[in-house]
């Protein structure tokens, strides 16, 4: 009985298995016939192309699983349907990304140094940092890429340096402009549930580069819009620029992680104040300062003039125009006002275009060598004149040093006194709140130490003080004019001359202590352009001077101070101006009962 029961069970199970197989076969045949009727028989050509391409990819196992799962979905769609197109775009994006595909680095340090020096003049700190990275990569063999931020005034070569670094290392180069970026999805991409969804610009740039370790320039990172209704793009960049997180960057469109840890990110910025602090902390900051006139002349000779001669076609017959040094210097000082060389390049191009017009019309160049007198024929009258020291003939006029996002410049602080019972302080010159506060602090210090100047205190009760900073259309702010304002007030009160060819920069406190300020190199360049020979600054700024190459310091003597009295001891001479103002003090009348 047991044997018969066993046979019956086996027979039943076998029949069920056969029925199931027949059912599956029947269903598969039906699906096949339906696909053939719809024109999608043995899989679409796109399906087979993707399947073939996938065999050569070196992607992670998790990514492969997602890809093949999505590929199976593609097979189910009609090629004429919108879903097929959406799915195909997604799969093509995945297949075109360079998963674990890297270009081989050329780690020849001597060659890299030559490439960087050939393409860019100066920039020693940046070049040194790139060579350090290459050296460690050469010794260790594997290294997370640094996140570098180059900041400085416009036109100094921050963006173009990225191409040179890529050429030096033989890596792919890609650039992404962040100026005006206001939507987080531009970085992270859109989810595929949205119509017209696509990956973010980071993933698209990597796809364009065709390598997982390109040199990636994030241009104008300080111009990213913050806290918008479409999400905060600067917050999305935190994941991209964090070495601890970017090995698994998550794009909303891909919905899988992509490794960005081998990408050499180089951000550029003009002003660090507009970059959010968390983003700033993730980057290694390297300052790219402006150029002095001698450096600009060298850059013009080596790069700008040869490039523009080629661009204007003036080298076709081998008869090239030449600029002498004095002509280049005149263009720099009277036709441009910048720390970089962008405007210089435009002026050189403008001059050569004029020559190209003459040559095309007359058949020959009017002159082979361009001199200072001929620059006006080509460029017109100079729009600028050198910021020059204006002498010390007037009391109350002191030269200060300022720093803006486009470089350094000199400014003049003027103080005058006028008869008035209120003893009022007036500030003009489009000054910001911080600079106004500096003026108030400077005046209060002078009042507290009026005896050291030998002036009657009652002058503040009977004379008004007016402080003005020329070029009123230009906004001015910051605390660094503190010692300049204090010296200007002291000079106006005593009618003593200020030492010749002297400028100063430094913040002051109510106690008269001088505090360090920033932008020292840019301020030194501005002082040199103006013919200043002596600069007064805080003693704590000496460390900044020690880091500046000697070529920038040539011809300038520095005087380090700790308090305002030190400033006055050096800056105020014993000589009275030619036509001093006589401050009369009226005695108070007492009525007797």
Please report, for each region that a protein language model flagged, where it lies by residue:
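Conserved C-terminal "switch" segment of AAA+ ATPases
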Residues: 57-65, 100-102, 210, 271-349, ...
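Walker A/P-loop
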Residues: 146-178, 207, 238
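AAA+/SF3 P-loop NTPase mechanochemical coupling elements
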Residues: 209-214, 249-268, 322, 463
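Conserved catalytic/switch belt of AAA+ P-loop NTPases
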Residues: 220-258
């Amino acid at each position: 009985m047991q044997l018969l029961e066993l046979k019956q069970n086996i027979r039943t199970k076998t029949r069920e298995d056969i029925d199931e197989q027949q059912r599956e076969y029947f269903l598969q045949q039906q699906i096949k016939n339906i696909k053939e009727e719809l024109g999608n028989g043995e899989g679409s050509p796109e399906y087979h192309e993707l399947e073939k391409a996938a065999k050569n990819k070196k992607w992670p196992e998790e990514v492969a699983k997602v890809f093949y799962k999505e590929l199976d979905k593609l097979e189910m769609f009609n090629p004429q349907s919108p879903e097929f197109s959406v799915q195909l775009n997604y799969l093509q994006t995945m297949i075109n990304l360079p998963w674990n595909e890297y270009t081989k680095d050329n780690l020849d340090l001597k060659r890299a140094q030559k490439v960087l020096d050939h393409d860019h003049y100066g920039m020693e700190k940046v070049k040194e940092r790139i060579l350090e990275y290459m050296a460690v990569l050469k010794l260790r063999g594997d290294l997370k890429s640094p996140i570098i931020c180059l900041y400085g005034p416009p036109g100094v070569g921050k963006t173009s340096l990225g191409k040179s670094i890529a050429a030096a290392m033989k890596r792919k180069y890609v650039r992404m402009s962040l100026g005006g970026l206001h939507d987080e999805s531009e970085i992270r991409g859109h989810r595929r549930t949205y119509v017209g969804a696509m990956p973010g610009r980071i993933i698209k740039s990597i796809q364009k580069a065709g390598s997982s370790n390109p040199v990636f320039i994030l241009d104008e990172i300080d111009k990213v819009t913050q806290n918008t209704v479409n999400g905060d793009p600067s917050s999305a960049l935190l994941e991209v620029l964090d070495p601890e997180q970017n090995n698994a960057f998550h794009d909303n469109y891909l919905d899988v992680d992509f490794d960005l840890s081998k990408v050499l990110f180089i951000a550029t910025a003009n002003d660090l104040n507009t970059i959010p602090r968390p983003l700033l902390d993730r980057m290694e900051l390297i300052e790219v300062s402006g150029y002095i006139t001698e450096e600009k002349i060298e850059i013009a000779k080596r790069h700008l003039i040869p490039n523009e001669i080629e661009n204007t076609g003036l080298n076709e017959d081998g008869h090239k125009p030449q600029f002498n040094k004095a002509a280049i210097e005149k263009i720099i000082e009277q036709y441009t006002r910048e720390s970089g060389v962008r405007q210089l390049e435009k002026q050189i191009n403008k001059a050569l275009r004029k020559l190209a017009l003459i040559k095309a019309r007359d058949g020959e160049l009017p002159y082979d060598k361009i001199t200072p007198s001929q620059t006006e024929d080509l460029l017109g009258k100079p729009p600028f004149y050198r910021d020059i020291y204006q002498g010390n003939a007037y009391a109350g006029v002191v030269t200060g040093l300022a720093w803006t996002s486009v470089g350094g410049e000199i400014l003049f602080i003027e103080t005058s006194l006028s008869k008035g019972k209120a003893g009022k302080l007036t500030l003009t010159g489009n000054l910001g709140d911080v600079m106004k506060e500096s003026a108030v602090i400077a005046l209060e210090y002078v009042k507290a130490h009026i005896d050291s100047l030998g002036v009657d205190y009652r002058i503040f009760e009977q004379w008004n003080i007016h402080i003005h900073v020329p070029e009123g259309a230009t906004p001015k702010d910051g605390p660094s004019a503190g010692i300049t304002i204090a010296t200007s007030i002291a000079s106006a009160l005593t009618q003593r001359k200020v030492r010749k060819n002297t400028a100063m920069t430094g913040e002051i406190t109510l106690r008269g202590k001088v505090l360090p300020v920033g932008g020292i190199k840019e301020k030194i360049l501005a002082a040199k352009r103006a013919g200043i020979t002596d600069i007064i600054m805080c003693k704590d700024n000496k460390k900044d001077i020690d880091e500046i190459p000697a070529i920038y310091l040539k011809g300038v003597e520095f005087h380090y101070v700790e308090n305002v009295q030190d400033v006055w001891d050096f800056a105020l001479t014993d000589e009275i101006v030619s036509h001093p103002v006589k401050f009369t003090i009226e005695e108070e009348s007492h009525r007797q009962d």
